[in-house]
Swiss-Prot record:
GO biological process: chaperone cofactor-dependent protein refolding
Keyword Chaperone: yes
Keywords from the UniProt entry: Chaperone, Cytoplasm
Subunit details: Heptamer of 7 subunits arranged in a ring. Interacts with the chaperonin GroEL.
GO molecular function: ATP binding; metal ion binding; protein folding chaperone; protein-folding chaperone binding; unfolded protein binding
Name under which the protein is recorded: Co-chaperonin GroES
GO cellular component: cytoplasm
Chief localisation class: cytoplasm
Function statement: Together with the chaperonin GroEL, plays an essential role in assisting protein folding. The GroEL-GroES system forms a nano-cage that allows encapsulation of the non-native substrate proteins and provides a physical environment optimized to promote and accelerate protein folding. GroES binds to the apical surface of the GroEL ring, thereby capping the opening of the GroEL channel.
Highest taxon in the source lineage: Bacteria
């Protein structure tokens, strides 16, 4: 299924964290934190400025981003879990 976000919304796929600590301890699913890192899968056209002009988004498809633990809205498409969030929910781009 193809999905194109509208306006300043972004489709992000979470990057799963390690299931083992550096010391070799296996972390059970119940103790794992939600990942705050993800890969941008699709972006909208941008947001409208106060003057009515379109302001393009800074993030682009393929960027690795950091976001707040509870950011975005969880959706499921084609058996995969994604987040739909606004550009304001993204804290930064990993380079």
């Amino acid at each position: 299924m193809k999905f194109r976000p509208l306006h300043d919304r972004i489709l992000v796929k979470r990057v799963e964290e390690e299931t083992k600590t550096k010391g070799g301890i296996i972390i059970p699913d119940t103790a794992k934190e939600k990942p705050i890192e993800g890969k941008v899968m699709a972006v909208g056209n941008g947001r409208l400025g106060e003057d009515g002009k379109l302001i393009p988004l800074e993030v682009k498809k393929g960027d690795r981003v950091l976001f707040g633990k509870y950011g975005g809205t969880e959706v499921k498409m084609d058996g995969q879990e994604y987040l739909i969030m606004r550009e304001d929910d993204i804290l930064g781009i990993l380079e």
